Amino acid sequence: MASIMEGPLSKWTNVMKGWQYRWFVLDYNAGLLSYYTSKDKMMRGSRRGCVRLRGAVIGIDDEDDSTFTITVDQKTFHFQARDADEREKWIHALEETILRHTLQIQQGLDSGFVPSVQDFDKKLAESDAYLQILIDQIKLFDDKIQSCKDDEQRKKIEDLKDTTCSMVESIKHCIVLLQIAKDQTNEEKHADGFISTINPVDSIYQPSALESVVIPTMPTQASPVPESVQVCKGEPRPSSLAVGPVVSNLGSRQSPTPISTGSGQSAPSSSLTSPSHVNLSPNTVPDFSYSSSEDEFYDADEFYQSSTSPKRCMDSSESATALTHSSTGASLKRPDTTESLNSSMSNGTNEAEQFDTHDDRDDDGEGESVEEHKSVIMHLLSQVRLGMDLTKVVLPTFILERRSLLEMYADFFAHPDLFVSIGEHKDPKDRMAQVVKWYLSAFHAGRKGSVAKKPYNPILGEVFQCHWALPGLENDENPEAVSEGPIPWASKNNVTFVAEQVSHHPPISAFYAECYNKRIQFNAHIWTKSKFLGMSIGVHNIGQGCVSCLDYDEHYILTFPNGYGRSILTVPWVELGGECTINCSKTGYNATITFHTKPFYGGKKHRVTAEIYSPNDKKPFCSIEGEWNGIMYAKNANGENTVFIDTKKMPTVKKKVRKLEDQEEYESRRMWKDVTFNLKIKDIDAATEAKHRLEEKQRAEARERKEKEKQWETRLFHEDGECWVYDEPLLKREPSLRY
């Protein structure tokens, strides 16, 4: 490519809260993107600002084909090209520039010495051994601190311990990254020898470093390697470079949406010798990216500035050795509780003791520090690649939430009273409004904290069963069991729930709920596509649910929003996004619900809006706005505002699950009990081993079915077209209940 490329782009400014036209010059040799208010100012050398490209990260968004971001030096710069083609030209040029200036030429290549894989393994084992020695020595600090009588001396020891813990954490990361780098070199390469570094998803655009680089037209330049490593993957495309592992330092990302003010811009041009360019030699490159008005040109508030010295020792759950089953090393065991699963497995006689209550826990650890969140996510970044489906990844055990995805779906019914009251309304208009109310209340209970953790990927054939007692009916003196229902030991006044993992590839979960006395049921299936998106993690929920109100023969078809884990390297938080619908074909009532993601240039988190329509009406009779995990307000056709839902004041009803010893071996809590227990006591090695046993058993069963040419037979659900339907729904068991 040419040594210099120039052209117009629009740049987002915080002062003007909009896009402004700028003339950009990309200097390949200097690794610098400079910008000017006009081409004339560029010719006079009046530079407005610049972006250093060494160690930079490029971000793109598949929902907007003209914008992109560059994150470097703890700043995020937002740009907008004229169209997708122009953005591709800039990104391609920026990619090659970043590649060149992010590389570190291996020392010793000129001498002809080429280390072998055996040399690498030996050094890696030595590093791990020294790490274990250091970890053992750290334990002596606690004894020293306790025995120290002098406050000043104790403070010095505590500071020394903090510094040592910080160093241990860095060493752990280094060992993990070295192992990942080794594994990456063994991966199968594309037939043409090229690996693309672009994957147009809601993600970052991240170039990859070269294992060995030869750029015939450009002199090479050594550069320090940045702190963290991420591996990217995409579709093959023409390139002159063989691409391998990547080095980057990530920040948070939000997608810009304003319309470009740079319409009619000319395409970027490039030239080797154009006299109009202001050439910059490497020694004129500034130490940091800057603008003439710093906070005018980047979103500084997007980044959390952490302390330079973390004030905590790395938890065992963050141990680098738990990243893969083949990793070596040791983890720190720090039991923080004496509680065990055995406490919920005692054989009691009263009703309260017949069920397992270990769901009354704070899995998400809201009190954990931001640094701990960052450390967890850094391990994830080290293992996965851009655009990779996380359901296909053997995740490090410590990043898992202590429950199965099937159990998480049960939280849709944390307000069972709202669900069963749908059929109590006589007017179809009110029934639709009640369906929307239950739907909007169904999401906040599933997310109690901000830590980016992932439920267990359910095993094929895994089942989860539970039920809820309706408020006010908890002490039913004469409960009548539903022997033919999904939960035979539940009463007719209970809301019962059952879920099954009906497919492993693709991962599809089906679940069903009913209340016999209220004559209502719900059937749904969700195919989860969990993708690593660089700056965030996205979960696309593909599928639908159906609320069936048997007394009126009404069926409400609904869809589910996508989920995103944002700002995963700073203060992680979860948001929902996407447009969902609820339709009743019989009555014609319908609703549109939009979960709004937070834009980078402002706005609130967790916003949701909804509009409910009567049949054939284009104007909604009810508009809803608020936060899906807070308060939502309804505005009727007369303009009156009322509180629609207040999730802060609505108590959730605890689900009831059978004791572990009463469960079948394929039920979720029993199947995952060893993993759950060891995660709870922070024994990550034991949890990893238990998880590995489950995965190996699943693989062995799959091989056996393949050898015997047998198909998997589901337990409770069957496929009906593109849907998965419960075998014995209430509508089928009680035909007399039909309208």
Curated annotation (Swiss-Prot):
It comes from the Eukaryota. Residues 249-259, 277-292, 306-330, 338-352 have a biased composition (Polar residues). The keyword Cell division does not apply. Keywords: Lipid transport, Lipid-binding, Phosphoprotein, Transport. It holds the Pfam family Oxysterol_BP. PROSITE patterns: OSBP, PH_DOMAIN. PANTHER family: OXYSTEROL-BINDING PROTEIN-RELATED, OXYSTEROL-BINDING PROTEIN-RELATED PROTEIN 9. Belongs to the OSBP family. This is Oxysterol-binding protein-related protein 9. It comes from Xenopus tropicalis (Western clawed frog). The gene is osbpl9.
